[in-house]
Structure formats: structure tokens, C-alpha cells
Amino acid sequence: MNFENLLIELGTEELPPKSLRKLAESFLANFTEELSKADLAFSSAVWYAAPRRLAINVTELALAQADKVVEKRGPAVSSAFDAEGKPTKAAEGWARGNGITVEQAERLVTDKGEWLVHNAKVEGVETKSLIAAMAQRALDKLPIPKPMRWGNNKTQFIRPVHTATMLLGSELIEGELLGIKSARTVRGHRFMGLKQFELAHADHYLADLKEKGKVIADYESRKALIKADAEKAAAKIGGTADIEDSLLEEVASLVEWPVVLTASFEEKFLAVPSEALVYTMKGDQKYFPVFDDAGKLLPNFIFVTNIESKDPAQIISGNEKVVRPRLADAEFFFNTDKKHTLESRLPSLETVLFQQQLGTLKDKVNRISALAAFIAEQTGANAVDAARAGLLSKTDLMTNMVMEFTDTQGTMGMHYARLDGETEAVAVAMEEQYKPKFSGDTVPSAGVSCAVALADKLDTLVGIFGIGQAPKGAADPFALRRAAIGVLRIIVENKLPLDLVDLIAKAQALHGTNLSNANASDEVLEFLMARFRAWYQDKGIGVDVILAVLARRPTRPADFDSRINAVSHFRSLEASSALAAANKRVSNILAKVEGALPTTINASLLTEAAEQALAAKLNELQPLLAPLFANADYQQALTLLAGLRESVDQFFEDVMVMADDEALKNNRLALLNNLREQFLHVADISLLQ
């Protein structure tokens, strides 16, 4: 057998749950990179991870590097021998260094001459002698922001390390990892099974840990088990568990032997908005809330414990006692907050600074209110509701509930607005103003919500750029990139008839004399246009398509999107590459013209059949294209323009544009200028690759 399975395990103290997957994936990626660098073949590799261990398993790993022949070139033959044909000192020194005589050297003939060469056979190194060093290098490259030392050890790692195991098949690999000598000892569960045991073979790792150590080392298996058992537990009480993947990942990273249990809380707490209860259950306690078929929160929750108890009722009771005070806090905050309207909290916003040069939160909501009304007027939304929602948009930040449970901002604003008797549009806008919160999140769809969300983001963008604090490098303390993408997505996905230039100008005017950067509006526009490029690239749109549209500088995002879609479709047409090349040729010709470009086409000067045909085709298309351009139906316009391919090809085949006759030349330049202008109504397709 010339291959074996490899197991490497690092036994540690409890690893940070939110970092566990990343650590394990990085460990595997780093180690397989080491294998590739060492030219060690293997079939597959996987990672395992539990709260107190990181492990990797490599299947069918070659037991040694393959032997290889290394060409060692010596001096040129012309300088390797003297006039009498005897080896020179240079040749003899080279041969001696390679363990051969000059006579044993081979000859290599190249186009630059003939050389002495020695094809040396290099035997592959045994894998077992390489593993420890490769594993250590893989660990050294793990993404650990704050490593720690322990005991008298000088070694640093994310948590103290207690065991290291490296097995190639049944053979123990000698060496150290993070200062710990490799041994067969593997630690089991803290409270169940064997505290530690000897691992005989790499292939026994998962089974032995599960049977002897009461540890499910396979992260994905553990995660799947928790999900399945939680779903079953919820179904038993007539509900559906809210199993968010990020929480499921965290819970799977906290337990080695997951046991799913169901608990309950008093129904009186259901009078509190469910979002606050869910926040404390998921965020603080790592519980899975349960909802009925109508989406209403049930007075139950599902939790995962790390031990099989003889008395699970005691564990359930303990968790119920832990969560009760948190729910009682939420109830108290809610009842206290209801005593004051959101409007009554407006003066308190004056005590909170938004930004030193941009004023307080009260200043900000005043600007948001005015800008939201301006946007609503342009989109056909209720401007009165938009202004009201903008004014109240940050008042829930002053409530006890949001101060305690920060992730409920906006959501609690919606509930309090309803209790205050605000319109439903205002209430919904209170929650949706922060959308989209992350990549993949939905955007607000209601008109008032869109107006407030846009106003909030644009106020921040223009304000921060206006005081000269634009993002630099990776640093973006005000999350301006996310705000910019949010602005674009809201406008594009709702097809809103808004122009960025107008929005930026209005936002800048509302800041008054606060802004010190005279170029703020231009910089914000450039920033937004750059986000367009990043956003479309993430969606898989070709860079050349994006650049073709950017060349026209459309500042209406919905219009920009229509152009992107049209050019993307145009690229799929058979005629696109030829027309792109022709447009590039036209651009190059026109760029060389000094002074103003001729624009008038004189039909009597169209002497060649090919130019007559092209002019006729353009005349035929223009009345059809005009309404398409006016209605932003760019896809249909480019589809019609694709029909020009044969006429354009024939024109360049038969017609000399730069004719000696000045009148003919200018007429042909005017024809080409007209041709290019039709395409430029959509994009500069000469930039398509």
C-alpha cells in the first residue's frame, strides 16, 4: 500500500463559537495548501470541529513524495572545454558539485547553444517526516486576532491546547503542535463517556469519539441533528421552530453532544411585541422560538443542552428560570414606554449627538423629514406621511426597550407608532427605514417607507462626505458603502423615477452651512456610481457592460438598470461583436477629427451604394427608435440597431471615409456620427469586449 488516511486533531479549551467554522475551514485549507506545495497526492480532505477540538482528515494520502528528475544545467560546452578539449575548472567544479564527472554529463542543445546538463534523480521524502511541520505552518496561518499564552508556555493560540494527535493510518506521527507532543490520547466529553482514550487508527476517529467519548466531532452532522430534533420538538407542540442558520451554527459550536429539549414561559409575556421576546430568546439565551401556523409566537422555546440528563425536567426548569427575568424586563420596558408617545420623545433627540459637525439626532430627523417629503412628491407617495415618518424615525432610540434590546430599533418604533395612532404607512416606515440591513435583505416596497429609507441614507452620505470623512481603504465607520448600495437597490428594485443629482442637491441644501467640503455633491455621485459597478459585478454582469453604460453617466438608477439589462441582452445577439468592433472603429475615426464633428447628412453626396444603404437604414430606424428611447425601452432599441450589422459591415468594406474630397469626407463623418449617436442613446458599445 502506498497511501494511508491521515488524522490530525488538536484538543483545546472551549473555542469561540462564532469562530469555530472559520478556524476549522482555514486549518483544512492551509494544510491542503501545504500538501500541494509538497507534491503529496491525496484523494480528499475534510474538517471536523467541536467546542474543544479542531481536526482534519485526509484520505488516501501518498506515503511519500514521488521521485522526480531535476535538470541541473552546467556551463555551455563552448566554455566547458579548453582548446585541447580538456574540461575547464568551471566544468569540473560543476560536475563535482553534482557528484559526477564531466564525462558523465549529458548534452542539451537549445536555440542558444549547447550545454552540459545532469538529470539528477531526487528521491521523494516520506510523508510522515513532513506532516508535523506542515500542520504547524497551517496552524500558524489561522485567522486569530487575539492569540493567548497559557501556563509557562511561550506558544500562542486562540485557546490553551492540551492534546495533539497525528495518525497516518495506525502509525503515530512524532512531532509537536503548538508545543504539545503528538500522542494517541484523545479527550472525550467533559461529563459523559470516557474522559480520554487511546486512538488506534485514523479511521476510528469519528466512531470512537462518538461511542467512547460521547462527542459528535462532525460539525455538519451535529448541526443537522440539532435542526432535525428541534423541528420534531416544535411539531410535537403544534408549532414551527424559528431556526435561523446563524443561530444554528452558533449552537452547534457550543455543544459536543446535543440534546434538544422544549420549555415554556408564561402566556402573559405574549402581550409584549414578539420581536422583543424573540430577540432575548435568540440573542441572549441561544434558544429557538416557536411559532404557530399563523406566524404567532407560542409561549414555548426549544433549547439545546450539552448533556444527557437523568432528570431533563430539572434542566428545563432551570432554563425557564433563566429566561423569565429577561422576558419580565421586556414586559416592564414595553409597559413603561407605552406611557409616552414617540412625538413626546422628540426633545430628547436634542441630547444625542449624531456627529459633531452635523448636529444632533433632532437635527438629523428634521432633515430626513424634509428630504422624505421631497422624495415622496416625486414618487407619488404620501408626502405628509413621509414627513411625519421622517420626523419620528429615530424617536424609538430613546425608549427603554431599544436601549436594552438594540436590535429592535425600528421594529419597536413601528409598534409604538401604532399604539400612538399614527397612520399605518408611518408605522411601517419606522421599521423599514433601515432596509436593506445586509446583503440579500429585502428593500422597502411601500412608497412612504422608500422615501424615509432613502432620505436617511442620503442625509448620512452627503453629510459625512460634506465634512471630508469619506471611506478610506477598508475603513468605513459610518457604513457608507452599505448606505450607497441601499440607495441604489431601493430605487432600482422599486423602479422609482428619481435622479441622484437632484437627491444629492436637496440633501446638501438641507445641511445648510454644516458642510465644509465644496466638492461633496460630486464626490457622493462618484461614490454612488462606483457602488453601481461593484453591485453589478457581484450580480455577475460583465465589467465591459458596466463600463459601456457608465460612459453615458446616467444618474437615474432605474434608467441605469434598464441600460445594463439592455446591453447584457445585446451582447447575446449574434451581431453584437461586429457592431461593437464597428463602433470602436467609428469612435477612433471621429476622435481624430479636429474641431466640431459634422452633423448634417447631404443625401446628394452619398455616392457609394454602401453609404446610401446605411443612410437609408438609419432613416428607416430613427422614427422607430425615438419613442423607444423616450420610454427607456433600451433593449428593443438595441435589438433594432442590431439589424444595422450588414449595412455597417458593407460600408466599411466599400467606402473610404477619409476621402480626398472634403465635402464627401465630411458627409461620411456625419453619417458615422449619426450612427454612433443612435447607440450612445443607450451605451458606448465600443467598450464591449
Swiss-Prot record:
InterPro entries reported in the protein's UniProt record: DALR_anticod-bd (IPR008909), Gly-tRNA-synth_bsu (IPR015944), Gly-tRNA-synth_heterodimer (IPR006194)
GO cellular component: cytosol
Keywords from the UniProt entry: Aminoacyl-tRNA synthetase, ATP-binding, Cytoplasm, Ligase, Nucleotide-binding, Protein biosynthesis
Primary residence: cytoplasm
Gene Ontology MF terms in the entry: arginine-tRNA ligase activity; ATP binding; glycine-tRNA ligase activity
Biological process, per Gene Ontology: arginyl-tRNA aminoacylation; glycyl-tRNA aminoacylation
Pfam families reported in the protein's UniProt record: DALR_1, tRNA_synt_2f
Reactions catalysed, as given in the entry: tRNA(Gly) + glycine + ATP = glycyl-tRNA(Gly) + AMP + diphosphate
Enzyme class: ligase
Localization (cell): Cytoplasm
Subunit structure of this chain's protein: Tetramer of two alpha and two beta subunits.
Family under the similarity heading: Belongs to the class-II aminoacyl-tRNA synthetase family.
PANTHER family hit by this protein: GLYCINE--TRNA LIGASE, CHLOROPLASTIC_MITOCHONDRIAL 2 (PTHR30075:SF2), GLYCYL-TRNA SYNTHETASE (PTHR30075)
Protein name stated in the entry: Glycine--tRNA ligase beta subunit
Organism listed in the record: Shewanella baltica (strain OS223)
